[in-house]
Amino acid sequence: KSFAVIALALLSGTLFVATPVSAAPATPSGAARTAPWNSETTELEADNRIIYGRLPNGLRYAIRRNDRPENQVLVRLAFEFGSAAEADDEQGLAHFIEHMAFNGSSNVPEGEMVRMLERLGLSFGADTNASTGFVRTQYKLDLPKADPELIERALFLMRETASEVTFSPGAVDGERGVVIAEMRDRENYGFQRNRAASELLYPDSYFSTRYPIGKKEV
């Protein structure tokens, strides 16, 4: 089977979904077709197989058919916000919020989101993950099959990630330890080499002053 790539985006981000053509939704109710998002910032010719649009709430989307992978659904939610936007006393908060997104939300009990994903057949890490960069934070779900109910549940969880994440004191304290452990793991030769190169090549830019991993004291 072939599948459609669906990209849904907030004004500050993008969500990508890949589904079989038979499961690809029609243009959402109330949505408006738009020109390609980056048509004014690139000289590359737009792919006319991609359908772009915007929902009434500002969410942007793009849909494209493809042939691989077969009968799978790939979901990507990307916010155009990362460590470069942080103030001195906020370094690492974008990355920390990314971690908290998997803890719980207004409609998903604390600690239940990962278990919910596993019940849907996803493996945490391989099929469910997230990353924070200098200018973008991205979440991913790779669904094992193109089941409409599974797609609906995945989009529900992405909606929770976009606007309903909760920050209970206990969950924050617990995740702080996880992030600190990640900091220790990254203090290796490769990371130190890259940091030294960034400080040499870009001494006054966020590439050398706003590492996504953040600072322990923050």
Say what each PLM segment does.
Residues V21-A26:
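Boundary at the C-terminal end of the N-terminal hydrophobic targeting segment
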Residues P69-E70, F79-R193, T209:
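Active-site-adjacent, His/Asp/Glu-enriched structural segments that form or flank metal-binding
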Residues L74, N194-S198:
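Short glycine-rich loop/turn motifs
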Residues G30-G53, Y139-D142, E199-V218:
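Histidine-acidic residue clusters that define the catalytic metal-binding segment
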Residues V5-A18:
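Bacterial N-terminal signal peptides
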Residues P36-A78:
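Mature N-terminal segment immediately following signal peptide/propeptide cleavage
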Residues K1-S2:
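Positively charged n-region of N-terminal signal peptides that target proteins for export
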